[in-house]
Structure formats: C-alpha cells, structure tokens
Amino acid sequence: MSSPEAIRTVHVYSMHTDPFAQPGSGDAGGMNVYIAQSVRAMLTINPQLKVEVFTLNRTPQAPERAHVEDPEWGSRLVRHYIDVPAAREATKNDLAEYLEDFAQSCVTQAMNVPDVIHAHYWLSGWAAVQAEGAWGRRIFPERVPNGA
C-alpha cells in the first residue's frame, strides 16, 4: 500500500445514504457520522488530499447539480449525487437493482482518478469492486479471499 503522502485522491462510495445528511433524517444515522468524520480526518491528516464522495440520489427530483464542493473544504472535498431516475425514492431494500448503474456512474462522473476506493456497506462494496476493475485501483478495505 502507498504511504499516506503518495495518496492524492480517495473515492468514498456510500450508495445507500449520504454521509453528510443530518443524522435522524431518512436512513442517516451513525454510519453517516462515521463516514463524514473519516473523510474530514483524511483531509486534515493529508493537506494535499482530494476526496470525492459518491452517494445515490434518493430524492423525488434530480439534484440541482451532479456534484458540489464542500463549503468547508472547497475543491478538496467534492460530493457527487448519482442520479438514477428509476432509483429515486427507492427503499434501501430495493437498491441492489441499481448497483450497476451506480457503479458505472461513479466512474464516469469522477473528477479525478482515485489512488484508493473506500466503500461502506455491502452495496457500496459491490460498486467499488466494479469500479476497481474500471480504474485498475485497489479498494479499501481490501477484499477478503473466499474461504478466509
């Protein structure tokens, strides 16, 4: 694995919930807080780092913009709202139907090639495996071999 200084761009996949959503709203809860704080910690530790966070848009309308820069971190933290029209307002239990669309959109909408892809929850992990093949990059946490 590269040293922290060698890592310039991290992609964070959180398909089922927006890490920056208000806890208690929708599916937002402890995992959201954990992911958001992890992203902030990475940015604090490495002042050269750029992080792109990808989440599925689950609101009734398309987002006003496909991505936004974070007000605190500027261009170092870009939040992507992946819009798959058929997935709008989908329940968490239905999201597996949209994995391929989400994974493909994460690759096509990215602003930078990632050095590392970090995924949370099995849905995001599956999307990260697909993106790993497209980007030729490692995922973190690393996949565990079958039978291990």
Protein language model regions, located:
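A structural micro-motif
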Residues: 49, 75, 137-138
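N-terminal subdomain of nucleotide-sugar transferases
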Residues: 1-69
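Short amphipathic alpha-helices and their capping/turn segments at secondary-structure boundaries
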Residues: 1-6, 128-139
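Conserved nucleotide-sugar donor-binding subdomain of glycosyltransferases
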Residues: 73-126, 130
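A short, flexible beta-alpha/helix-coil linker loop
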Residues: 16-22, 84-88, 148
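Active-site proximal beta-strand in glycosyltransferases
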Residues: 11, 132-148
